[in-house]
Amino acid sequence: FFRKYGVAAFIAMTLSAGSAMAADPDTGTITFHGLVSNNTCKISLDNKIDQDGNDFDITLDTVFVKNFATALGDNSTLGEKQFTLNLSECDNATVKDASAQFNSWGGSSSTSGGLLVPPANLQGAAENVNLVLANNGNGATDLIKIDQTNNTQKATISADGTGDLFYRVAYTQGQKWNADTSPVTAGTVQAQVAFTVFKKISQSLSGCAGGF
């Protein structure tokens, strides 16, 4: 059976033992917070990652409007924040590896190229800012194309039932950005993705608890 966490439900199905197959996917959401500032100096505040069940908040570094003067593209590292999905309590006798699929959520959307687009109707939101997600470990560094098949990074589940999936998120310009006629404006940046963790098993169904 497929397990349900908050935001997604899956059709139940029966699997027979004895061959490699996919285990119940775990699901959750990640909300990315950021800020584009008109200030001329940087003011720092301790940054933390908050967890509520399988729903997480990640705060990117504050950046400035001037940082968007030239095109950044999908290789941007502006304000980059690295984060990890930690898997634990996996049955390592049956769960062999894990991967995560990311889709837009909570009013966010995506571009055809897979960039994450914040909702446009939020009061005080920065304009012409998108977010770019990428793999950052387990031999994978490719762009995560939101709302497309993107669970390309595989984490091996170790003997103690743990595994890690490594990612990074950064600012980039929105698809309507133009340095002269449609520049980035100051304001908050908030976008959300839903993730589903898939686990490959060898004999029987098993689940993992994810968190960071």
Residue ranges and their predicted role:
Residues 1-22:
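Gram-negative bacterial Sec-dependent N-terminal signal peptides
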Residues 2-3, 21-212:
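Mature extracellular/passenger domains of Gram-negative fimbrial/pilin and adhesin proteins
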